[in-house]
Regions:
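Cysteine-nucleophile amide-bond enzymes
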Residues: 2-223
Length: 223
C-alpha cells in the first residue's frame, strides 16, 4: 500500500511538472516567434542596423564619437532570410539573429532612408550588393584608413550607399574632429599609430551615420 502511494505521488509530481511545461514554455516560444515575425515584417532590404559592439575597441569608439553605437551593417534579404552585411574580422554576411546576439544586451536600432521607396529600387539594391561584393572577405581595418584595401563597419555601409545608390549617409569627418582625449581612445591610438597619429585621415563613424537626417528609425529593440 505504501509503495502504491509513493508511485502515485511521483506520478502526480510529474503530471504537475508536465502541465507547467505545457502552459509556460510553449507560450514563451510562441511569444518569441511572434516578436521575430513582427520584426521581420518591418525590415526591408537595405536597412541599416546599429549596435553596441562587445569588441576590444568598442569603448574607445564610443568615447571618441560620444555615441553608444560602435558597430553597424546593412541588412540583406536572401532566400527569405535576413542577414547583416558587415565588416567584422572580415567582410561577411552574418545571419541577423546571430548578429544581434553579438551586441551588448541584445539591443539594436534599425534605420532606413526616409525616401527609400524612391531611391532603393530593385536595380539600385542590386547595384549596392554588387558594389558591396567587391569588399567580401577583406580584412577589418583597425587603423581606419580610407583606402579599400581593408575596411571597417561604418566605412563599408557608407561606401556601399555612396557607390551603389549615390547617397551619402552620414557626414565624413577627419580623425582630429573626434574626442581623442579619453583614456581608452589614447590607448588604442598609441597601439596603432605610436606617436604618428594621422589626424587628417578621412573617417566615417557609426554615430555620423546614425545621426544622419536622411535616416529614420524603423525599430529600436531592447531586451
Amino acid at each position: 500500500m505504501r509503495k502504491a502511494k509513493i508511485i502515485s505521488l511521483i506520478f502526480s509530481i510529474f503530471f504537475i511538472l508536465g502541465l507547467c511545461a505545457y502552459y509556460f514554455y510553449p507560450s514563451t516560444t510562441v511569444s518569441t516567434d511572434r516578436a521575430k515575425a513582427t520584426r521581420e515584417e518591418q525590415i526591408e532590404d537595405g536597412d541599416i542596423i546599429f549596435q553596441t559592439s562587445l569588441s576590444a575597441q568598442s569603448e574607445a569608439i564610443q568615447q571618441a564619437t560620444n555615441s553608444k553605437y560602435s558597430h553597424c551593417g546593412i541588412i540583406y534579404k536572401n532566400n527569405g532570410r535576413f542577414y547583416v552585411y558587415e565588416a567584422a574580422e572580415t567582410v561577411k554576411l552574418t545571419p541577423l539573429d546571430e548578429w544581434v546576439a553579438k551586441g551588448k544586451d541584445g539591443h539594436y536600432v534599425i534605420k532606413r532612408l526616409r525616401i527609400a521607396n524612391q531611391i532603393l529600387t530593385f536595380n539600385t539594391l542590386k547595384k549596392m550588393k554588387e558594389e558591396g561584393s567587391k569588399f567580401l572577405g577583406k580584412s577589418y581595418d583597425s587603423a581606419f584608413d580610407w583606402s579599400d584595401e581593408k575596411i571597417y563597419s561604418s566605412e563599408l555601409v557608407w561606401k556601399i550607399y555612396k557607390r551603389g545608390a549615390e547617397v551619402e549617409v552620414g557626414k565624413l569627418q577627419y580623425l582630429r574632429d573626434f574626442d581623442l582625449t579619453g583614456e581608452e581612445v589614447e590607448q588604442k591610438l598609441k597601439e596603432r599609430y605610436g606617436d604618428k597619429i594621422p589626424k587628417d585621415e578621412i573617417v566615417i563613424s557609426p554615430a555620423s551615420i546614425f545621426n544622419s537626417s536622411m535616416l529614420e528609425t524603423v525599430i529600436s529593440h531592447t531586451l
